[in-house]
Amino acid sequence: MASTDEPAAASGDSTARARQAEAIVNHAEHSISEDAIVAAARERAVDIGAGAVTPAVGALLCVLAKLTGAKAVVEVGTGAGVSGLWLLSGMREDGVLTTIDVEPEHQRIAKQAFSEAGVGPGRTRLISGRAQEVLTRLADESYDLVFIDAAPADQPQFVVEGVRLLRPGGAIVVHRAALGGRAGDASAKDSEVSAVREAARLIAEDERLTPVLIPLGDGLLAAARD
């Protein structure tokens, strides 16, 4: 006969695992230190109301850029340049970051951050415009890393374009892939959640891609292309 204590024990184990997972993520998020230039860019991001990746997400972007030997990178969502600085720190010294943002003011501020970091003008290509239009003008299989930090509603379209841009051996990274956990909540049906799930489906069903969901920031969906 099953013990009546089993459901309570199972619930307790689940709660303990959830707390442990939260503690691990919290430790990861606070284990990365940023230099003064990135910290200043982060402060400017707050001033202009532009989102910025967490230090742990930035460090992961740096690692992915190093692992892919990234020479050509596309970023959707320049913001104040925080993620761009992290990407550049992991790219090859002759690498070029193409970063797209619809807000010219964001790009002006990001350009300041890049200059403060000693990044030469030839290493960045800042394009002001709608990513929906800009991405379609970029060449197929010409980029080592694509980073998408955009509104959830735009993720499916940007994933399609981003995968098209990837060279074999490259990687695509989608920020805000968890929406604070809502993306994994079966009861959540709103348009943002639906769009994020569609982006994840597109990646999961592409046989050329090997994906992983990483619980940093607001969730990162990363995938390597064969």
Swiss-Prot record:
Pfam (any one): Methyltransf_3
Do the record's keywords include Methyltransferase?
A: yes
Q: Name one GO molecular function term.
A: S-adenosylmethionine-dependent methyltransferase activity
Annotated EC: 2.1.1.-
The record's top EC class is transferase
Q: Which UniProt keywords apply?
A: Methyltransferase, S-adenosyl-L-methionine, Transferase
**InterPro entries on file:** Cation-dep_OMT, SAM-dependent_MTases_sf, SAM_O-MeTrfase
Q: What is this protein called?
A: Putative O-methyltransferase Mflv_2199
Report residues binding substrate: D149
